Amino acid sequence: MKLRWFAFLIVLLAGCSSKHDYTNPPWNAKVPVQRAMQWMPISQKAGAAWGVDPQLITAIIAIESGGNPNAVSKSNAIGLMQIKASTSGRDVYRRMGWSGEPTTSELKNPERNISMGAAYLNILETGPLAGIEDPKVLQYALVVSYANGAGALLRTFSSDRKKAISKINDLDADEFLEHVARNHPAPQAPRYIYKLEQALDAM
């Protein structure tokens, strides 16, 4: 798999020389993954509750916060899975039937943060991304949507959600990555997929 991944990157980058090279600078996932793995018992519990692969949760923790539960970004994304209270946090609260949004202290609590991150992944999978058939493509779509929003991803295929999902189902994982690299408005979107693969390989 690693050789296939490397060979694909060479071909893709050769064909996209005018695009941002999302593999540079190289990202060493070893330390972030080691730090994220300490939260695996919580990730397993949250994954079981929400039907999300705990390895995917761990990879997102490694990418988003490097395993630091107190991490706060410039855009005020908070905690291990870098949840924004006013967007994904509010969506999770709504799914749970609660009003308002999570507090900063709640988002810095590892168990609450991971639970909300897993819940949000479930919201994406059963909502805007519902119908994606290939498990690997779904995994890629989940992380791109987690980082940059499902709407931004789907609009690169069609303004109509059903048509977008149908077009996604015509692609394998490598073709999906190439589409994201060529068409997604956020340069970090394909890099997130690159980091995901690095993190999964480091586990």
UniProtKB/Swiss-Prot annotation:
It catalyses: Endolytic cleavage of the (1->4)-beta-glycosidic linkage between N-acetylmuramic acid (MurNAc) and N-acetylglucosamine (GlcNAc) residues in peptidoglycan with concomitant formation of a 1,6-anhydrobond in the MurNAc residue. Its EC number is 4.2.2.n2. It is an enzyme of class 4 (lyase). Keywords: Cell outer membrane, Cell wall biogenesis/degradation, Lipoprotein, Lyase, Membrane, Palmitate, Signal. It is found in: Cell outer membrane. A lipid is attached at C16 (N-palmitoyl cysteine). One of its GO terms (cellular component) is cell outer membrane. A lipid is attached at C16 (S-diacylglycerol cysteine). Murein-degrading enzyme. May play a role in recycling of muropeptides during cell elongation and/or cell division. Preferentially cleaves at a distance of more than two disaccharide units from the ends of the glycan chain. This is Endo-type membrane-bound lytic murein transglycosylase A.
